């Protein structure tokens, strides 16, 4: 079932900004936009400032949209650090809002963690939170107002903001925690104002996501000319840099762009330019800017300039992670278009290469890459041998419209109704990322993970699996207080859902979660059912998982033909 995303034109711009809910200075239909001081252009040249000079133009109660993804991808680090230092030393600006569509950071102190300071930030609307845990901590401690839009919806909301549309209608998120009949995307106790509402249009339910208008942008490129026209030749991807710049510019704000170098006016190839100069108000040049955290200035394989020789198959160590990836590959067909998510699911592409079938299908990443060898870890998406790279917003358009045949996503918790939680668990806010966008429309959804967590140890080999130390954490729980994937909605849409672990495989049917496969060497009662908070339905066609999954040799797996 295709999922549509319908922009609705605003009758009278400017927009009603979310900041209006919290600040008397924000843009509303009845008030004027915030007025920004900005350095003037001289003879058309874009002002070039230090990062410290640039952030002085950010006023109290402004709404900052930050570009970037994990591992330092497109992160304007100098601007972020300068803003953090300005607040530490001057206690200004105060009470700003943060919009961050993609999770940037290193799951520790980088990303937007430096600006996660009480008093500096009043509210945040993010697609993903966990890459910058300091901002998550402010939300967990009820020190800021905190919202989560699905990553794809959020980037499309920014596009709507650029077009002065007050919101978007979408089926994405129905039945999940962003549905206002549940939590409405609110992440803590102090966040009360609704940004998402339920709408019935011609007999169908949609979620209406209010547009939140940004008025300050931190973006990054590789090179710009003296008028601000920018190219991304050393970058991993584009993300939604253009959408962010357009949204801030059209809402009367100020766009700050960090680059590695500047060149003479009109010397950049026009097809390489991704940001037109008239959108840029300030340029900050950082000659030491690197493509990713802690690496060389640029890796030409990651930037797509060089092709890695992948003719030699690299063997992956046999462990529980590989077992899950191998079994997940069985759900792929020739010619399929898939998405792979971060976590244990990201081993799919590596296993396919080992089996020699990686060219029989196309894997995509929501941030824009299409094809290639998927990277793992904090810089997920920094692929090599990529076939194409789209703007992130366009990638999500494709996903929302039902373009995916299959997706591979990791899970944190699953309940007896097939619902999945990844956004908030163990008291920590991780955020949804693109999970809701992807799982809402993919024709087949394959969730990947271990049956338990927290110290799980296994021995894999000779065609079987042995549990040597059971995990302390139960992942298959009776019920979920918050839902990131709705089993009920998936069944209503006719989607095919699998849950693959190292020792068992489940599928979702109308009467609940069915156990359909169990690993050789595993006892159903002792190792599976007793480790779940509910009893799964033992399928009448219960099978043993293919012993080849648990051997060190290449399986010789051949993909079945697509429909």
Residue ranges of model-derived segments:
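Glycine-rich phosphate/ribose-binding loops and adjacent secondary-structure elements
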Residues: 55, 94, 314-317, 326-329, ...
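Glycine-rich adenosyl-nucleotide cofactor-binding module
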Residues: 302-328
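Short glycine-rich or small-residue beta-strand-to-loop segments that form or flank ligand, phosphate
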Residues: 63-68, 97-100
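Conserved phosphate- and dinucleotide-binding cores of soluble alpha/beta proteins
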Residues: 32-56, 71-87, 99, 105-114, ...
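N-terminal mitochondrial targeting presequences
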Residues: 18, 22-35
